[in-house]
């Protein structure tokens, strides 16, 4: 996972969608995807669904899986096929870490910022306005982050469903959610690149290379080493058992420690992202109060502990992002490569993983889901699960067609 700043955003970046600019940059956007990410083929299925829903006067929410950092570019190529600009809800950190021109460009292709660690009323108002009034779809990635586990959709966060239900409550037009699956494949044998990355990772962790082992077994050895190091760091000893079990235990230990420090009730729902979000809000409020309020003076030792808490919460989300069973059985080349992509980001601390060869992308849209008005927690939870299952069905359909 990529490191990024957390706190109160320095500003809000509104969308400045410019349809003629989107049309004018089609070739450039496609060439950038080809040149920087070596995506030489993009296939589309069901993209006419978007045009049909827009022509019917409906508000359209697109909910794709977040396969890679540049999947939004592939999604835009799909929308180009039916001449549809798109709006994107984007984490404010993406804007704050971009150049002035990149921010300008993102706004012109429909991006606007959201603070995911708080209740961002400005972003919510903008999203609801788009769904109720604008003639173009809104894209929200309900997974929230890139987890590099395309074949298994990470549990959706509830924000997209809550926004859709809120918009439908007072909308004069029908609002639908269109599930979307996005997947990337290598078009050539990239095992030499995979082996090179494995050797780099093993060297970083002071492991000997075992070329006689399968790639997934070498990755498992890396995982064993990492979890043992982190157990020593946080617990002072190493546990026994499967990596997945030990990861869950370590996550719970870290979260409970921070929740106790900040007097936050321990959630029993097992919803790790929401627990992390609540703790980040608490820590950020204390750190910013020390800066903004003259009568608040947090001792240096406590400031350092708060900063460490933020680091620990980031580490918790890193652990959460590893399924533990993604390479079981006979994993595909793509699954092995995806897992190495994650390890490159987490261990080698690269902003973007290695592009290992020429690739093909597929973007598939599913049957629209009508959004009924209602904002109860049950409605939000039910719609979230429905959207997640519908997106998983698109990924499964992509895989079924390929084999």
Indicate where each model-derived feature is located:
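Membrane-interfacial terminal anchoring regions of lipid-handling membrane enzymes
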Residues: 1-70, 77-84, 92-94, 121-122, ...
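Domain-scale detector for complete catalytic domains at protein termini or as standalone homologs
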Residues: 105-106, 110
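Short, polar/flexible loop-turn hinges at active-site or ligand-entry regions and domain interfaces
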Residues: 112-117
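Membrane helical hairpin/interfacial module
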Residues: 90-96, 102-103
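Short helix/loop capping segments that flank catalytic or ligand/cofactor-binding pockets
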Residues: 71-72, 98-99
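ATP-grasp fold ATP-binding core
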Residues: 138-145
């Amino acid at each position: 996972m990529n490191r990024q700043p957390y706190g109160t955003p320095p500003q809000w970046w509104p969308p400045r969608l410019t349809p003629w600019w989107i049309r004018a940059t089609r070739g450039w956007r496609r060439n950038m995807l080809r040149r920087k990410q070596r995506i030489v083929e993009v296939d589309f299925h069901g993209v006419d669904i978007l045009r049909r829903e827009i022509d019917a006067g409906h508000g359209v929410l697109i909910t794709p899986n977040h396969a890679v950092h540049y999947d939004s570019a592939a999604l835009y190529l799909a929308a180009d096929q039916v001449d549809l600009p798109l709006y994107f809800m984007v984490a404010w950190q993406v804007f704050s870490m971009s150049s002035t021109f990149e921010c300008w460009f993102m706004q012109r292709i429909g991006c606007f910022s959201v603070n995911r660690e708080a209740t961002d009323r400005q972003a919510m108002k903008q999203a609801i306005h788009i769904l109720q009034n604008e003639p173009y779809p809104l894209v929200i990635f309900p997974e929230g982050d890139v987890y590099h586990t395309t074949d298994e959709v990470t549990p959706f966060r509830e924000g997209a469903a809550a926004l859709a239900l809120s918009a439908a409550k007072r909308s004069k037009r029908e609002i639908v959610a269109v599930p979307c699956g996005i997947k990337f494949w290598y078009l050539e044998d990239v095992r030499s690149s995979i082996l090179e990355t494995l050797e780099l990772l093993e060297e970083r962790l002071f492991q000997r290379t075992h070329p006689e082992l399968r790639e997934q077994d070498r990755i498992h050895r890396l995982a064993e080493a990492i979890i043992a190091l982190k157990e020593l760091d946080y617990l002072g000893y190493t546990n026994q058992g499967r990596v997945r079990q030990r990861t869950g235990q370590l996550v719970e230990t870290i979260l409970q420690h921070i929740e106790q420090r900040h007097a936050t009730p321990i959630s029993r729902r097992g919803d790790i992202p929401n627990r992390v979000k609540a703790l980040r809000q608490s820590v950020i409020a204390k750190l910013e109060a020390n800066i903004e309020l003259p009568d608040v003076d947090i001792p240096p030792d406590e400031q350092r502990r708060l900063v460490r808490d933020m680091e620990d919460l980031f580490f918790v989300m890193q652990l959460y992002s590893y399924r533990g069973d993604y390479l079981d059985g006979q994993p595909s080349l793509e699954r092995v490569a995806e897992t190495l992509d994650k390890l490159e980001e987490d261990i080698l601390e690269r902003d973007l993983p290695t592009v290992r060869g020429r690739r093909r992308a597929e973007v598939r849209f599913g049957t629209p889901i009508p959004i009924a008005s209602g904002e109860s927690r049950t409605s939000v939870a039910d719609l979230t699960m429905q959207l997640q299952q519908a997106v998983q069905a698109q990924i499964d359909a992509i895989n079924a067609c390929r084999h």
